[in-house]
């Protein structure tokens, strides 16, 4: 396998409490999140870490694709069964974003930040995308399984022209992939176990790249201008529109406005 990744090495870097987690490695796959869904559909309800060297159909938020060239990034999915209330979904997304940002910061010489909801940026370049999905039990009102997909642009590469804001975490291929994978997985596992931590949203606000910024957001197919004011305790983005009215966004696409007229 050209990946030359070791499941044993990754496992050895994880906390002892997660030493028995299943770890599946692929040289290339369509999508680690899609593989996670296939495993769940087959009845494999166990905590699992899926890692691929490349993806042929990587998935991002809102149905977008995620550029996933072989050997230039880390494409991983954690499958967990936390049995959480459905309304915790957005808070899970925020917790994972904070965890990934904290995990990747030691590998970057520049400060990292979170662009709401859960893209990780270095300066003005996106270096990591996160896609959280859930398998729910509506009768019991709980999330049975959570699928956490994390795509990291690890090493320097040429990106397609239609990805002008894409960037990379590291300039040189000198860091251990296993160390990055294990560090990210460890932080995410800790964050899900500590979801009620009152410091969570405080940390998210500190990492946010949007607060106080003029923004343009798309919601229900309509684009509007506003200012990002705050993040609420559930991870919603509090904004103020041009008429001075305040709203809370729980989903949608947001960008910083260059034209502030």
Please annotate each region the language model reported.
Residues 1-106, 128:
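N-terminal lobe of the biotin/lipoate ligase/transferase fold
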Residues 2-9, 18, 86-88, 94-112, ...:
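Long, positively charged amphipathic alpha-helical accessory segments at protein N-termini or as interdomain linkers
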């Amino acid at each position: 396998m050209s990946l030359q990744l070791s499941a044993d090495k990754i496992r050895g870097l994880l906390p002892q409490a997660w030493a028995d987690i299943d770890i599946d490695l692929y040289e290339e796959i369509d999508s680690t999140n899609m593989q996670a869904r296939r495993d769940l559909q087959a009845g494999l309800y166990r905590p699992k870490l899926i890692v691929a060297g490349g993806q042929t159909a990587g998935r991002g938020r809102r149905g977008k694709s995620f550029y996933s060239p072989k050997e230039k990034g880390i494409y991983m999915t954690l499958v967990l069964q936390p049995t959480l209330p459905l309304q915790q979904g957005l808070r899970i997304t925020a917790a994972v974003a904070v965890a990934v940002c904290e995990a990747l910061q030691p590998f970057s010489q520049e400060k990292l930040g979170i662009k709401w909801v859960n893209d990780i940026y270095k300066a003005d370049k996106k270096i990591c995308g996160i896609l959280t999905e859930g398998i729910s039990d509506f009768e019991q009102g709980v999330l049975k399984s959570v699928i956490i997909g994390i795509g990291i642009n690890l090493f320097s590469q040429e990106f397609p022209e239609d990805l002008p804001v894409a960037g990379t975490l590291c300039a040189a291929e000198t860091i251990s992939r296993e160390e990055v994978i294990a560090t990210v997985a460890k932080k995410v596992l800790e964050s899900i176990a500590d979801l009620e931590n009152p410091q969570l949203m405080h940390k998210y606000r500190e990492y946010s790249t949007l607060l106080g910024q003029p923004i343009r957001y798309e919601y229900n197919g309509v684009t509007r201008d506003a200012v990002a004011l705050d993040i609420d305790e559930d991870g919603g983005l509090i904004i103020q529109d041009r008429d001075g009215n305040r709203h809370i966004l729980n989903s949608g696409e947001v960008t910083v406005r260059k034209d502030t007229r």
